[in-house]
Curated annotation (Swiss-Prot):
It is found in: Membrane. SUPFAM superfamilies: Ammonium transporter. It is a multi-pass membrane protein. It comes from Solanum lycopersicum (Tomato). It holds the Pfam family Ammonium_transp. It comes from the Eukaryota. This is Ammonium transporter 1 member 3. One of its GO terms (cellular component) is plasma membrane. The chain crosses the membrane at residues 15-37, 50-72, 98-117, 124-146, 166-188, 209-227, 255-277, 305-327, 337-356, 377-399. Ammonium transporter that may be involved in ammonium transport throughout the plant. The gene is AMT1-3.
Length: 460
């Protein structure tokens, strides 16, 4: 068989695999939209659904113009400076399939942040921070970890602590970035009207539709099989000295570790919340499942299945504990996004530094070559190199996102374009900003049903 023909078939199969993974990750936007809509009150459902669409359309332009260049362009270990507006793509390193896959990741970050500031944010602010986050803040972090010359990258020439940080599919790059950005947005805006009473006690504001939350969670679960296993980028790569194994083996194992971590976190949250609140809560369980997925995303390709179970177990308690602290400090995040994506994402980075297996690290980053020595998890005898790199990544992301997104939200607040007025918040963003409710038939007769009625009621 002609070798060039074989190479073409291999490249085609790998391109199809990457494109299919990109489609799966994009399906997560639908999952996010359903999850967010069900987690807010009915009077804000249209608003939160629209923000998910905006994340995709605004993120498309910002990532095309600047984001991909900052993330994967050749320049220095901090930020890229080529491939602006996809100039010189396809290249020897990247093609259009890779861009599409990375774009799907970028818009997920903005979706995470949107959840933290739901039900009280002006629509203009969404446009501004979504463009900035997907076009600059997130791509810089992606460059650190995922480009070939990033200063934290496990693929760079000069490895931090002889290891580089392992964040295979983005517990830090995607979820911690989105969670910390959402944290600062929520801090600057403050709690929703009525979230805490005059004595500082929390007032329950449940989402209006558990059905949407459950369906959205299952869609996200489905999409995660593109998010984590898809991060190999290529499936048809054979490992030397292992004729029957290749990336296809690691892809399958990654799907298994992802499933086990999310499932374990869901079960622990089910019983943990039952002990705390006295009933079985579907919404809490869904967030627990997602917390497990977020945590395993960093080390999904480099840990054993049994370790993934431990990852999910701890992720559930991280989420439960952070939610308790959030109420104690009067922190209001309608979707628990900062706690879920920020807290569980941070745990995922630490977990990888503890339990990464050297054999799997070589498979994920060196195509299974055995003559290379790679630091592995601290608990598995791999020394402090990888663990130290994971801690540096965690702290660097927190500092970077805080220094960029914190001032942005503060500036938007000072300009008066971040938070809506109390009257608009009480009426709901759907009627005050979008011309009508998402569910007209479910509204009480005393409430305005259309934007014109809302204006007349405001003038009375």
């Amino acid at each position: 068989m002609d070798s060039s023909w074989e190479a073409s078939v291999t490249d085609s199969i790998n391109a199809i695999y990457l494109l299919f993974s990109a489609y799966l990750v994009f399906v997560m936007q639908l999952g996010f939209a359903m999850l967010c809509a069900g987690s807010v009150r009915a009077k804000n459902a249209m608003n939160i659904m629209l923000t998910n669409v905006v994340d995709a359309v605004v993120g498309s332009l910002s990532y095309y113009l600047f984001g991909f260049a900052f993330a994967f362009g050749d320049s220095n270990p901090f930020i890229g400076a080529s491939y602006f507006a996809l100039k010189d793509i396809p290249s020897s390193s990247y093609d259009y399939s890779f861009f599409l896959y990375q774009w799907a990741f970028a818009i997920a970050v903005a979706g995470i942040t949107s959840g933290s500031i739901a039900e009280r944010t002006q629509f203009t602010a969404y446009l501004v921070f979504s463009f900035f986050l997907t076009g600059f803040v997130y791509p810089v972090v992606a460059h650190w970890l995922w480009s070939s010359n990033g200063w934290l990258s496990p693929n760079s020439t000069y490895l931090l602590f002889g290891s580089g940080a392992i964040d295979f599919a983005g517990s830090g790059v995607v979820h911690l970035v989105g969670g910390i950005a959402g944290f600062w947005g929520s801090i600057v805006e403050g709690p929703r009207v009525g979230r805490f009473d005059a004595f500082g006690n929390p007032v329950k504001m449940r989402g209006h539709n558990a059905t949407l939350v459950v369906l959205g969670t299952l869609l996200l679960w489905f999409g995660w099989f593109g998010f984590n296993p898809g991060s190999f980028n290529k499936i048809l790569v054979a490992y030397p000295h292992m004729a029957d194994q290749g990336n296809w083996t690691s892809v399958g194992r990654t799907a298994v570790t992802t499933t086990l971590a999310g499932s374990t976190a869901g079960i622990v949250t089910l019983f943990g919340r039952r002990l705390l609140v006295g009933h079985w809560d579907a919404m809490d369980v869904c967030n627990g499942v997602l917390g497990g997925f977020v945590a395993i995303t960093s080390g999904c390709s480099v840990v054993e299945p049994w370790a993934a179970i431990l990852c999910g177990f701890c992720a559930a308690w991280v989420l439960i504990g952070l939610n308790i602290l959030a109420l104690k400090f009067k922190f209001d995040d309608p979707l628990e996004a900062a706690q879920l994506h920020g807290g569980c994402g941070a745990w995922g980075l630490i977990f990888t530094g503890l339990f990464a297996k050297e054999e799997f690290v070589l498979q994920a980053y060196n195509s299974g070559k055995t003559q290379i020595i790679r630091p592995s998890g601290l608990i598995l005898g791999g020394g402090w190199g990888l663990f130290g790199a994971q801690i540096v990544e965690l702290l660097s992301i927190v500092v970077w996102v805080s220094l960029t997104m914190g001032p942005l939200f503060y500036l938007l607040q000072k300009l008066g374009i971040l938070r809506i007025s109390s009257d608009e918040e009480v009426a709901g963003l759907d009627i005050s900003s979008h011309g009508g409710y998402a569910y007209d038939a479910s509204q009480e007769e005393s409430n305005a049903r259309f934007y014109g009625e809302y204006l007349r009621m405001q003038q009375q």
